[in-house]
């Protein structure tokens, strides 16, 4: 399923809307405190939700999910498009602190279930609402 055609302009638009709608309620509870600490990255904990939402919007034929464990042994998620372009909406949690995301260890993955899937749906509804008003 594709909600919107996949092209550079739509990718930029949707990426901005996704990032603008990332809020603490979309982070697993275990990560919320880490984000609230002074100097913490506001992107930490959002990588699965943001990446999965992007895939839901543009479809699995256009966007694939990838993940790898980082230097803290925590999973990091990002997307790769049909042309092999890496799309990481939450990369600032690494680059903003002088670290590199674990792309070199990336493996294809699927959307997580349970609470993760619910958070993706909440974000997707927010993004759809913005897109409907454009």
Where are these regions (language model features)?
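A structural boundary/capping signal
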Residues: 1-134
């Amino acid at each position: 399923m594709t909600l919107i055609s996949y092209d550079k302009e739509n990718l930029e638009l949707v990426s901005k809307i996704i990032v603008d709608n990332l809020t603490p309620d979309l982070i697993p509870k275990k990560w919320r405190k880490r984000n609230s600490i002074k100097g913490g990255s506001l992107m930490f904990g959002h990588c699965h939700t943001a990446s999965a939402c992007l895939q839901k919007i543009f479809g699995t034929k256009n966007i694939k999910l990838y993940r790898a464990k980082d230097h803290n042994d925590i999973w990091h998620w990002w997307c790769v498009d049909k042309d092999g372009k890496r799309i990481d909406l939450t990369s600032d949690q690494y680059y903003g602190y002088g670290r590199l995301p674990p792309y070199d260890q990336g493996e294809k993955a699927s959307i997580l279930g349970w609470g993760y899937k619910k958070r993706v749906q909440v974000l997707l509804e927010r993004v759809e609402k913005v897109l409907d008003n454009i």
